[in-house]
């Protein structure tokens, strides 16, 4: 009676364990399905914001304003500007020709211009372009006493403290008088510094001839001086065919060393967001995204209340919190961006005779694009949380999680050597090789060396002795030693994980079986596959397996051997538990596992001894 009671309690606990497994697997499946719907919605939302026409519009505009030069003078396009003379040639030539389109290719007057230029006949110039200059004061640096007789003036690099705020030159109009900023546009991060808004501003005219005369007047009156550090050329376009705005900024920086460094920004953005039916579909996806965000936030709050400090011990929970934070930032950016469009767009489009500052809206559009791109990246990374139902993927994810400590230790050693070589390259080659001109460039150059994309001739020419030594030792220690050490860590951990997985079944793999079973049930429900019960009935109805085998042509010896093997299998299954037919299993302790391992070793020794004896017997029999 006591044994029956004990058996009943064991069966009940076993049934509860099985039920708990099923509940856990079902919950995981529900979370997986819900998350896939969220991920699909997020992908539609993000890819719906990107239009292939954005790239083509940027390409067309960059070709017009960066690559076009005056016929016969190659150094008059914007990319090749190296001096003040080249800059004025560009302003009076390619820039004017690119901004003012008032006739067709056959010199006929464009119709319905309404006092606006149409670049490439399709892109309306919004308002008028603006040219803005920032300067530094004299005596912002010191001249060494031995050279003061040769040079009394000194203009340092640009900083907000060194900026010149005084009027100069003719001291009339805004191009000669300093104007403070009245916009919320972010400061510009250039090659040589961070430039704030404001400065000496010149607004172009609607007339091409007036603008050209003004450029000539500025050049003759030396608008660009030794204190000039940067000039911005800003203007905006709108293409109604693809509903895109193109905000363009051309930047010419004047370093203290002399010469000119050019850079540019082309932002094709969709400021009129809800126009077509597809746009409203994207809006519905945005609303759905907010609903998902509310649901996921509620779930995580409940988990934190339930598990408290234990919640923060899982790396997946930290990823969940990071993803929620990014989603909230994306929603706040999108809300602020849409509010600013609603408040500013109408005013900007009305001011046709003034410069329309769309740069502020373009920057916020880029910020939102960046944050939503980072969000969808981590959303895809979270997929690894749900792939444990597949044995191979579970082994890979377990390998990465188990070798984290080893990789961190390896990374410390790797980056010590890596940064040491980066400093060596910067100090030895920095003044002569562009790839090592800054410490950041040195780091990226070394990554390129690892990938095999590097100009060895440059460092060899800069330093014929240290150049080859630097290159060979870097390749040896980083490429041959450290990277192979990294692969060894991964391989060793993967072997350990694979051995652990071969010992016993994991609960995670039950999820895969449940998915397969659900798939089979769906096929059977729609009659795309015969039910397993029907197949069993059909097999039983045809008679005994032996009779069926005789009908199929098997001889009696094969049938008897098969029946004997079946009896042996049934006897073994009664005596020993089989992992294939067990519904549940009790966890094995470390002590039990050690005893089982030692027992397996002893069995292996006995098998080896028996094998030797058997070989001896075979040799004796063969010798007779």
UniProtKB/Swiss-Prot annotation:
Keywords attached to this entry: Coiled coil, Glycoprotein, Ion channel, Ion transport, Membrane, Transmembrane, Transmembrane helix, Transport
GO BP terms, alphabetized: detection of mechanical stimulus
Source species taxonomy: Eukaryota, Metazoa, Chordata, Craniata, Vertebrata
Coiled coil residues, start to end: 556-576
Organism: Homo sapiens
PANTHER family recorded: POLYCYSTIN FAMILY MEMBER, POLYCYSTIN-2-LIKE PROTEIN 2
Subcellular location, record wording: Membrane
Subunit structure: Interacts with TRPC1 and TRPC5.
Bilayer-spanning residue ranges: 32-52, 277-297, 315-335, 361-381, 407-427, 470-490
Record family assignment: Belongs to the polycystin family.
Sites carrying sugar chains: 115, 138
Residue intervals annotated with topology Extracellular: 53-276, 336-360, 428-469
Gene: PKD2L2
Cross-referenced InterPro entries: PKD1_2_channel, PKD_2, Polycystin, Polycystin_dom
Record's keyword annotation contains Phosphoprotein: no
Main localization (coarse): membrane
GO molecular function (one): calcium channel activity
Function, as annotated: Exhibits a lower single conductance but no spontaneous channel activity. May function as a regulator of calcium channels or a channel component involving Ca2(+) homeostasis.
Any single Gene Ontology cellular-component annotation: membrane
Membrane topology recorded in Swiss-Prot or TrEMBL: Multi-pass membrane protein
Top-level taxon in the UniProt lineage: Eukaryota
Official protein name in the record: Polycystin-2-like protein 2
